[in-house]
C-alpha cells in the first residue's frame, strides 16, 4: 500500500509571555492509503493538536508533514469531523450536506447528485427534507459524516466524533461510520480516548506519550470480524486492550 500521510520528525513549540512550551517533539508515523489509523494517548498530550497540524491549521516548528508526497496546505482535500455534528438547525439535512460544496464553489449538479447518492446509499434519503432537531444523535452523526464525504476528501480527520453520544448509540454509530468509511475506501485518522474504540476500528494505532507528545508505540490489531462490534468479540481483543492500557497508566 502507498504511504498517503507521512509525519517526519514533527515538533511544535508554543511561545508564551514567560516561557516556551514544547507540545510535540520529533513525532514520526505514517498512514497508508485506505488505512484507518487511531491516535490515542493521555489526556492533554496533544492528540487534537496533531490533527490540527495534519489539517494545516497549525504550522510545525520543525519537521515535515506530507500528504500524497506534497506538503500540507497544497490544496489537498481533507475532511474534518468534530465532536459535535455542527449541523445548522435552520437548514434541512439536504442543505446541510450541500454546504461544503457551496463553500468550496463546487456546488455543481454532478456533486449534488453524488450527495443524494450517499444519502440513498446509507438510508438517509427519506430524511433529506427534515431538520437536524428532528433526527436522533446517531443519525445526525451519520449525516455529518456524509457531509464530510461529499467533496471526496483524500483523508478524513475524526476528532472524538462519538464522544457526545450515549454508550449504546455510540457503539451503533461507531459501527456505521466504520462501515461507511471502508465502503467508500477512505483513509481515516481518528483521535479518541476510548481504547476499545481504537482497537475495534483501526488498522493501526499510534500511542502517544505525555506532553511533549512523542510516539510511544504502534500497534496493528488483527482481529476477526467485519465490524467494530464483531471485532470486540474476538479472543485477542482483550490482549490488545491490556497492552495499550498499560502504556497509558
PLM segments and residue spans:
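The feature captures the beta-strand-to-loop junction immediately N-terminal to the Walker
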Residues: 40-42
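Short helical segment in ABC ATPase nucleotide-binding domains corresponding to the A-loop/adjacent helical element
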Residues: 94-102, 112, 220
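A short, proline-enriched helix->beta-strand linker immediately N-terminal to the Walker B motif
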Residues: 150-154
Amino acid at each position: 500500500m502507498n504511504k498517503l500521510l507521512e509525519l517526519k520528525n514533527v515538533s511544535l513549540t508554543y511561545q508564551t509571555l514567560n516561557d516556551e512550551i514544547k507540545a510535540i517533539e520529533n513525532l514520526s508515523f505514517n498512514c497508508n492509503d485506505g488505512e484507518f489509523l487511531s491516535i490515542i494517548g493521555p489526556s492533554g498530550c496533544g492528540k487534537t493538536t496533531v490533527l490540527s497540524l495534519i489539517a494545516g491549521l497549525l504550522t510545525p516548528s520543525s519537521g515535515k508533514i506530507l500528504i500524497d508526497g506534497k506538503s500540507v496546505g497544497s490544496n489537498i482535500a481533507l475532511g474534518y469531523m468534530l465532536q459535535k455534528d455542527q449541523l445548522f438547525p435552520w437548514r434541512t439535512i439536504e442543505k446541510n450536506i450541500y454546504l461544503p460544496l457551496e463553500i468550496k464553489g463546487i456546488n455543481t449538479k454532478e456533486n449534488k447528485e453524488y450527495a443524494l447518492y450517499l444519502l440513498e446509499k446509507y438510508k438517509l434519503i427519506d430524511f433529506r427534507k427534515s431538520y437536524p432537531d428532528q433526527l436522533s444523535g446517531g443519525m445526525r452523526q451519520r449525516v455529518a459524516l456524509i457531509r464530510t464525504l461529499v467533496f471526496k476528501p483524500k483523508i478524513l480527520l475524526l476528532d472524538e466524533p462519538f464522544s457526545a453520544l450515549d454508550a449504546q448509540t455510540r457503539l451503533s454509530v461507531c459501527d456505521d461510520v466504520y462501515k461507511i468509511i471502508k465502503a467508500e475506501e477512505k483513509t481515516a485518522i481518528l483521535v479518541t480516548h476510548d481504547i476499545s474504540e481504537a482497537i475495534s476500528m483501526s488498522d493501526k494505532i499510534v500511542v502517544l506519550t505525555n506532553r511533549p507528545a512523542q510516539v510511544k508505540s504502534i500497534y496493528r490489531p488483527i482481529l476477526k470480524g467485519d465490524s467494530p462490534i464483531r471485532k470486540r468479540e474476538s479472543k485477542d481483543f482483550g490482549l490488545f486492550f491490556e497492552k495499550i492500557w498499560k502504556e497509558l497508566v
